[in-house]
Structures are given as structure tokens and as C-alpha cells.
């Protein structure tokens, strides 16, 4: 059975059972501070389990793109090593929100597996929760009794809290679960060892395929459980594992989910993959298989994340995506011999394979490919640089063990993979101080955890089952009651309180727009300031540094009108900017992200070349023309999404929209948007682009200002121009005067360079007398009174006259220390010397660094006082 048919039959089955089929949510999560990515099928329905919203149907089914790489569900280091873990995977799921419970969930799961998919009953085992004295939760007798009617009792297994009690996190909805496991071993293997003994024991052919979670409890901050007001069902079935079972394979990677990618990797790299049924393979072949599995898995995770709007970066979710991609690159580099980018080429195959089920991977194909290629180029350079640095560490090492601190520095500062370090050391007969490395890694993790630790108390509920109303589109103040609150403590923010109101005029941070600030006024006039507003799990959270004295009273919630006006001005300007870019650069332009603050706006968009100054001016003029036209805001609320799209509204990629949406229209600009906006474009006053640049391959970023910030910008420019005129003695044409000064300066620089070259030549004879012969090397380390360019000329002058030369010159031109190293080419190889390594090592003494070629390199720094020590240490390289 093909994977496309497996997916379709699942959705068709649950549709026949009265379930509404919904699309997958984006793999990247928004408005949930506890998760970076969708790591399970239920993540997009979390707000319903928490009671913060009502689903469109009490019965829902879907296939959800998931990513598991960090936290509780950390599978990253296992991926590729075994045959059934993945970073990105599909989770087939069906849900009941206060509707059916255990009986229907279990019976339907059994019906689908045994009657539709026709998995033999004798290949299946199930588990039920054995109970927990610690939590005072009894054995799940109900689930056991249901299973008894479907399967022999000797195939029902009792599971402990670890395996059969599912929790959303440290706090929140949870409950017992019942897992279904499939035994894919041969008849001969089954005769030798019972499958029952292998369930939940990490056997590659006895694996869990479906988990039915019965949500009936809430875990409180103190660890205790309380009953939920309604019972829910949350099930998840691993699509890749199901395909393995239905296609008669013993590895997920041998199914048609992965084999097209694997065959393409073979074609590109020349490597060969052996499927799981091939036995007796060599260790070298096993390593190659692992590398191919890693690449095939990771390109899916990275491409889907990029397609959903998450670019690789150095922080947060972007850093996780970069880590995944770099793991794939280094496996290719180490075990497949790939020294050039190749992973980006797999996006085409992935698009062909999965584009029908997930159209975003097809529409964003070019972006995914370009971003991955740029990341590959960058990291391959890092690997080359790391190899040079590792060579320097090895060269300066005494003994047969490399210090773990040194290895950690390569890993942490330069991004050089520790497993690659260990491999290279092993090849050279050296050992890695793994204990020292792990110690440094653990210290870093502890520092990171301590810095980001957040402790949240339980919600103190004042009003049960209250639905929050947002009134902030229409007014900036509202009489409110606090419905619940809690205390939160973090290293970053200290103690703060989170408040939820029955109604709020405050806009919570979402959709790229920052949250409102303002205050809460009690009836006696006491004020509590609201320092920020967030949107979490479909509820607006108001952050304060203290609680009102009478928490159950009635308050006037007031938004800071000035900040809201500035933020709204910038948000409306992003819509006009988007329209202008599409008009002037082309309709290929797509918004890839934005940040709207009260002070400025940032807009990321797809475009594969730098936007010229002329184009930027044209875009700026377009937006300002729309502002001068005084276009009124035409807003439509709660209209069907299909109708909005038919009316020409633009939907932003990576955003999750409900069935009912809001549209914002200014003239011909129409977008789906939940943010706040000006009533008329004239309220924006003026739009000014202040910067344009690249964010990633194919992604450009414009930063701009409007309103008061634009006025302040022009006032500042006027002051600067006046100061320039004054400095030029009130020249009538300051531009002409500046160009004349630049021309004069260039002539003087040329004269100065000629003088310095002459000075260097004159110094050559004196310095030649100071050369010392050490181990067959003509050595000199000295500070010279030249600029860096002069030091370079001097080094080359000496190099042209003397063989076996090793010189290090230091300069302190304009207070900036600089080191210049020249090594004769004949001793670079014979003495295993490298100028780049030399300046990197000596650069530490001047608080800097640098690099270059093996025979010539430079390093800059900040500490002039370190020059003496750097020069003194230079001789160690030739001793």
C-alpha cells in the first residue's frame, strides 16, 4: 500500500465516523511560550484542552507535521542511528472534545488497523495504565475491559506511568493512555522470543504505532492532579511507522516515504544504501547507511520548517533548525565524502513526493533550496576553518590526549562538531578528553537553563468557564473583571503576574505586532500598570508587576493610546509596503515575516537580489502616495476565509487561519490580518525606509519608520546637514565640497602610502641584522612604527630577500593593535607551520583574532598592552 493511500484511508475512515478533517497546522508554533515546534498532533488543539476556546467540531481528525528535537521529546541524537526515530514526522490523529471516550476510541482504532489496513491481530499488542499510588490514580479497568473483547488477554500489557500516562508538560491536561504495538519480526524470530517481552524495550521491529490518550486530569503546579470538567480523547499514530508495517518493511527508511530521497542521495553522492533486510554489512557500509538516513530525515525537517516560515538562525527555533541541518552536513562531509553543497538538491524530490499533501513545500520550493544551499556553503567553510584550528591544537599539544576545554572551545565558539573532532583525533592516534568536554557542555547547559528558567504557579480561577471578549478594535478602555491570575517568576523578569480579564481592549502580541501597554484602574483610583500583553493558547494575558488590592473588584482597563497609535501606524504601513513591493518588484514577492513596534517596522520578503536604491525610492514614493490619498480603513470581521480569498485578500504563509477571518483594506491593498490599524492612511503621516539588506538566501529585509519617528528622523537629518554646512564653512553646495575633500584625501593617502613604502624599504636593512636563526629558521618578532599596510610591505620585502623566514610584526596604528605574520613557503610544509594558526593563537593576547593563508596572515585586536606578550610567545612556534 502506497503511503498516499495510507494517509487517505485514515482520513476517510474517521470522516465516516463523523469527524471533521482539518489541515495540518504549521510545524512552527506561535503564541505558545512552552513549545517552539508542533511536537505532537494535539499541539494545535491545546487551547481546547485548556478550556480557552471551542473547536469547530467535537470530533476532529488530521495528519499533523511534527518536529521533535528538544526538551522532553528529544530524539535528535537517535535519528539515523536506529531505523524508526525521526526529527520531522507525520502524526495521524483523531480527537474528541467532550464527546466520545474510551469505548469508541479503542474500538475504532482496532477496526481501522485490523479491518481496513488488515494488520494481522496476532502481530498486535496493547498496553493499559497499571495505575499510580503516587498520583492516587487507579488501574485503568475500563480500558482493560474494552480490550478484552477485542484481543486475547495475554496480549494486553500493564504499563507504568512513564509509558502509559501522557502529560502535556509539567502542568496541564493529562491522563492514562493505551498504546498499540506491532511486531514486525519473522515467524522464526517470534517463535524464539515472545513479542510481549519486547514491547517498550527499544526493539527496532516491535514498535508502538498508535497511542490513545484519555484526557481526564489536570496537573497542578504543586504536582497534584484534579479532574477535568470534561473528558477528551487525543490519539496519535506515527505515519512512517504505520507505512513500515503496511509495506512489509523492518525500517521506516525502507518505505516509499524515504526511498525516493535515499535514491536521490545515492545519485548525487555516489554512495550506496543497503536496506534493513541486508545482513552482514561492513562497519563502513553501516556508517554510510546512517549518514544517508540522517540526510534523508533532516532535509525533510529543515525544508518543512523553512516552508512554514522558520529560517535558520543563531537563536531560538532558528538555532534548532540550523543544528539539524548542520548535523546532516557533517554526516555527509564525514561519511559520504561531500565537500560541496548537495542537500539543497533534495528539495526538488521532496516537493514532488509530498507537495500534493502539503502544498506549502511545493510553493516554497525555491526558497527552501536557496536557504539550505547558503547554509551548506557557510557551514562547509566553518568545517574547513575548524580543521585548521584543530590542526593548531594538535600541533601545540603535548601528550596523546586533547584537553576537553580546547575541544569545547572549537565546538562552542567555532561550531566545529565534537564527533568530527573525536574522529580526526582517532585517525591521528590521539584521544579526546571526553569527560572534560562533557563537563564544559554541562556547565553551559546549566547556565542556559538558569538564565531561561521560568516558574509558573497554578491559575487562581475567580470566574469559571468565562469566555474572554476582545474589544480593542473599537475602544481603548473597558470595564473589566479579572477571571483568573497567576504568579510567574523568571531570572530575566523576576516576579510578575499574569492576569486574564472577561473582556479586554489590550492587543496581545501576535502576528508580528507587539502587545499593548497601559494600566488597570480600581474604583478607588489605585492603578496597576500593565507592562506587556501576550497571546497564549487563544487567551490574552496581561503582565503586571503587582496585583490589585481587591482582585475580585471591577476595574477600568486603559490602553496607552499614544503607543497604540504609533504601532497601528507602522502596521498599516507594512500592508502598503507589501503592496508597493509587489507592484514594483513583482508578484513573486511574499511576506516572510514582520515585526511591528511603536518605534519602527521590519518587513521580510522573498526576493532573490538586492533591491536597488532606485527601486527603494520607488517603493517609498508608492507608499507615501497612498498615505496622501487618505484611504479609509475598510474592515470586515468574521467572514469565511474562502470568501476573503475570493475577494482578493492576501494570506500570509506560515500563518494559521480559522474558518472565519478578518480582512483589512486600504484602497487596493487587502490582507487577512488580526492586528490594529489606523482609521485612514493619512494618520501614518509619512513613510521612510531606513535600511534594506539580506536575512538569508532569497529573503530581504526592509526596516522603516512612520509618524512621529519619521518626523524626528527628518529633524535629525536637518540638524546634521546644518552641522555639515557649518564644518564646510557654509558651503552653498555641501555635496560638491565633500566630493572635493574626498578627492584631496585620496591623493594625500597615496602620498602617505608611498612614503611608508620607502620607510619600510629603509627599515629592511636594519631589521635584517636582528634576524635570529632558530632550528634552521630565520626568526624575528618585533613592533614596528608603521600602519598595517606598511607592516605587510615590510614583511614581503624581507621575504623576497631571505629564505626560511618567520617574522611577526606588531603595529599600534591609531591605537589599534595588529599582528602580521609572514612565513616562507618552503618552511610552511617542511616545518608544519601555518601563519593563520599563528595569528589566531597570538591574537588572544591582544583580545582579537584573524586568519589568512598558511604563508601570510593578520590579526586585529583591542588590547594594545598585549602586544609585548604576543611577540614574546611567537618564538614558541619555531623552537
From Swiss-Prot:
Per UniProt, the cofactor note for this protein states: Binds 1 zinc ion per subunit.
What is its EC class? ligase
Q: Which UniProt keywords apply?
A: Aminoacyl-tRNA synthetase, ATP-binding, Cytoplasm, Ligase, Metal-binding, Nucleotide-binding, Protein biosynthesis, RNA-binding, tRNA-binding, Zinc
Q: Which GO terms describe its cellular component?
A: cytoplasm
Primary location recorded for the protein, binned into one broad class: cytoplasm
Query: What residues bind Zn(2+), as annotated?
Result: 571, 575, 673, 677
- State whether keyword Chloroplast applies: no
Location in the cell reads: Cytoplasm
Catalysis performed (reactions): tRNA(Ala) + L-alanine + ATP = L-alanyl-tRNA(Ala) + AMP + diphosphate
Pfam families, sorted: DHHA1, tRNA-synt_2c, tRNA_SAD
UniProt superkingdom: Bacteria
**Is ATP-binding found in the keyword set?**
yes
Q: Which SMART domains match?
A: tRNA_SAD
Q: What does the record give under GO molecular function? A: alanine-tRNA ligase activity; aminoacyl-tRNA deacylase activity; ATP binding; tRNA binding; zinc ion binding
Cofactor requirement: Zn(2+)
**EC numbers for this chain:** 6.1.1.7
Listed GO biological process terms: alanyl-tRNA aminoacylation
Its annotated function is as follows: Catalyzes the attachment of alanine to tRNA(Ala) in a two-step reaction: alanine is first activated by ATP to form Ala-AMP and then transferred to the acceptor end of tRNA(Ala). Also edits incorrectly charged Ser-tRNA(Ala) and Gly-tRNA(Ala) via its editing domain.
Q: Which family does it belong to?
A: Belongs to the class-II aminoacyl-tRNA synthetase family.
Domain comment, as recorded: Consists of three domains; the N-terminal catalytic domain, the editing domain and the C-terminal C-Ala domain. The editing domain removes incorrectly charged amino acids, while the C-Ala domain, along with tRNA(Ala), serves as a bridge to cooperatively bring together the editing and aminoacylation centers thus stimulating deacylation of misacylated tRNAs.
Protein's name according to its UniProt entry: Alanine--tRNA ligase
Origin organism is Flavobacterium johnsoniae (strain ATCC 17061 / DSM 2064 / JCM 8514 / BCRC 14874 / CCUG 350202 / NBRC 14942 / NCIMB 11054 / UW101) (Cytophaga johnsonae)
Amino acid at each position: 500500500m502506497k503511503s498516499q493511500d495510507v494517509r487517505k484511508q485514515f482520513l476517510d475512515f474517521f470522516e465516516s465516523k463523523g469527524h471533521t478533517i482539518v489541515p495540518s497546522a504549521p510545524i512552527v508554533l506561535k503564541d505558545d511560550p512552552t513549545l517552539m515546534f508542533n511536537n505532537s498532533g494535539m499541539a494545535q488543539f491545546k487551547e481546547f484542552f485548556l478550556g480557552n476556546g471551542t473547536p469547530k467540531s467535537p470530533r476532529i481528525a488530521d495528519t499533523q507535521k511534527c518536529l521533535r528535537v528538544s526538551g522532553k521529546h528529544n530524539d535528535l541524537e537517535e535519528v539515523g542511528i536506529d531505523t524508526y526515530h525521526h526529527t520531522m514526522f507525520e502524526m495521524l490523529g483523531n480527537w474528541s472534545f467532550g464527546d466520545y471516550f474510551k469505548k469508541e476510541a479503542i474500538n475504532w482504532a482496532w477496526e481501522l488497523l485490523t479491518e481496513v489496513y488488515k494488520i494481522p491481530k496476532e502481530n498486535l499488542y496493547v498496553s493499559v495504565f497499571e495505575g499510580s499510588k503516587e498520583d492516587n490514580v487507579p488501574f485503568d479497568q475500563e480500558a482493560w475491559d474494552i480490550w478484552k473483547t477485542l484481543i486475547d488477554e495475554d496480549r494486553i500489557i500493564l504499563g507504568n506511568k512513564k509509558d502509559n500516562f501522557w502529560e502535556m508538560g509539567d502542568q496541564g491536561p493529562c491522563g492514562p493512555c493505551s498504546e498499540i504495538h506491532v511486531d514486525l519480526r519473522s515467524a522464526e524470530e517470534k517463535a524464539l522470543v515472545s513479542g510481549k517481552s519486547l514491547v517498550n524495550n527499544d526493539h527496532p521491529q516491535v514498535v508502538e504505532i498508535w497511542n490513545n490518550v484519555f484526557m481526564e486530569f489536570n496537573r497542578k503546579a504543586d504536582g497534584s492532579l484534579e479532574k477535568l470538567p470534561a473528558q477528551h480523547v487525543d490519539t496519535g499514530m506515527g505515519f512512517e511507522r504505520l507505512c513500515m508495517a503496511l509495506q512489509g518493511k523492518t525500517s521506516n527508511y525502507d518505505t516509499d516515504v524515504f526511498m525516493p530521497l535515499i535514491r536521490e542521495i545515492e545519485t548525487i553522492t555516489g554512495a550506496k544504501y543497503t536496506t534493513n533486510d541486508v545482513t552482514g554489512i561492513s562497519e563502513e557500509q553501516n556508517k554510510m547507511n546512517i549518514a544517508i538516513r540522517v540526510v534523508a530525515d533532516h532535509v525533510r525537517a529543515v525544508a518543512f520548517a523553512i516552508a512554514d516560515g522558520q529560517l535558520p538562525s543563531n537563536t531560538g527555533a532558528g538555532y534548532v533548525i540550523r543544528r539539524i541541518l548542520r548535523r546532516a552536513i557533517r554526516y555527509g562531509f564525514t561519511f559520504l565524502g561531500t565537500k560541496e553543497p548537495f542537500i539543497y538538491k533534495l528539495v526538488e524530490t521532496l516537493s514532488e513526493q509530498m507537495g500534493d499533501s502539503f502544498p506549502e513545500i511545493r510553493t516554497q520550493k525555491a526558497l527552501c533550496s536557496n536557504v539550505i544551499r547558503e547554509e551548506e556553503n557557510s557551514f562547509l567553510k566553518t568545517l574547513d576553518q575548524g580543521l585548521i584550528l584543530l590542526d593548531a591544537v594538535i600541533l601545540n599539544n603535548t601528550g596523546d590526549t586533547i584537553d576537553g576545554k580546547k575541544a569545547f572551545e572549537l565546538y562552542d565558539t567555532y561550531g566545529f562538531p565534537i564527533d568530527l573532532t573525536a574522529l580526526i583525533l582517532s585517525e591521528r592516534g590521539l584521544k579526546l578528553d571526553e569527560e572534560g568536554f562533557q563537563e564544559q557542555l554541562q556547565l553551559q547547559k546549566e547556565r542556559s537553563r538558569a538564565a531561561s528558567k521560568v516558574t509558573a504557579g497554578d491559575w487562581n480561577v475567580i470566574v469559571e468557564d468565562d469566555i474572554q471578549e476582545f474589544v480593542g478594535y473599537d475602544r481603548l478602555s473597558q470595564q473589566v473583571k479579572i477571571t483568573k491570575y497567576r504568579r510567574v517568576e523568571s531570572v530575566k523578569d523576576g516576579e510578575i503576574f499574569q492576569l486574564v480579564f472577561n473582556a479586554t481592549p489590550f492587543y496581545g502580541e501576535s502576528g508580528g505586532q507587539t502587545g499593548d501597554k497601559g494600566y488597570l484602574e480600581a474604583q478607588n483610583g489605585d492603578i496597576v500598570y500593565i507592562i506587556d500583553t501576550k497571546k497564549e493558547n487563544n487567551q490574552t494575558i496581561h503582565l503586571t508587576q503587582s496585583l490589585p488590592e481587591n482582585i475580585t473588584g471591577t476595574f477600568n482597563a486603559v490602553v496607552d493610546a499614544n503607543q497604540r497609535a504609533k504601532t497601528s501606524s507602522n502596521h498599516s504601513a507594512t500592508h502598503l509596503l507589501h503592496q508597493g513591493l509587489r507592484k514594483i518588484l513583482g508578484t513573486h514577492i511574499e511576506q516572510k515575516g514582520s515585526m511591528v513596534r511603536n518605534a519602527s517596522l521590519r518587513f521580510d520578503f522573498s526576493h532573490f537580489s538586492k533591491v536597488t536604491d532606485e527601486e527603494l525610492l520607488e517603493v517609498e514614493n508608492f507608499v507615501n502616495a497612498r498615505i496622501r490619498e487618505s484611504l479609509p480603513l475598510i474592515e470586515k470581521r468574521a467572514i469565511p476565509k474562502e470568501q476573503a480569498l475570493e475577494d482578493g485578500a492576501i494570506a500570509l504563509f506560515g500563518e494559521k487561519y480559522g474558518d472565519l477571518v478578518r480582512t483589512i483594506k486600504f484602497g487596493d491593498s487587502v490582507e487577512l490580518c488580526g492586528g490594529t490599524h489606523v482609521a485612514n492612511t493619512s494618520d501614518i503621516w509619512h513613510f521612510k525606509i531606513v535600511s534594506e539588506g539580506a536575512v538569508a538566501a532569497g529573503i530581504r529585509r526592509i526596516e522603516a519608520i512612520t509618524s512621529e519617528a519619521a518626523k524626528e528622523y527628518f529633524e535629525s537629518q536637518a540638524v546634521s546637514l546644518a552641522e555639515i554646512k557649518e564644518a564646510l564653512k557654509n558651503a552653498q553646495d555641501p555635496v560638491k565640497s565633500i566630493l572635493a575633500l574626498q578627492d584631496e584625501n585620496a591623493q594625500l593617502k597615496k602620498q602617505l602610502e608611498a612614503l611608508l613604502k620607502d620607510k619600510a624599504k629603509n627599515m629592511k636593512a636594519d631589521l635584517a641584522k636582528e634576524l635570529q636563526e632558530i632550528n634552521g629558521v630565520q626568526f624575528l618578532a618585533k613592533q614596528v612604527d608603521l600602519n598595517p599596510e606598511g607592516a605587510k610591505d615590510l614583511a614581503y620585502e624581507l621575504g623576497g630577500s631571505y629564505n626560511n623566514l618567520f617574522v611577526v610584526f606588531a603595529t599600534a596604528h591609531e591605537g589599534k593593535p595588529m599582528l602580521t605574520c609572514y612565513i616562507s613557503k618552503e618552511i610552511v610544509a617542511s616545518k608544519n607551520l601555518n601563519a593563520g594558526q599563528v595569528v589566531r593563537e597570538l591574537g588572544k593576547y591582544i583580545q582579537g583574532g584573524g586568519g589568512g593563508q598558511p604563508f601570510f596572515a593578520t590579526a586585529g585586536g583591542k588590547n594594545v598592552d598585549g602586544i609585548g606578550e604576543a611577540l614574546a610567545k611567537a618564538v614558541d612556534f619555531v623552537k
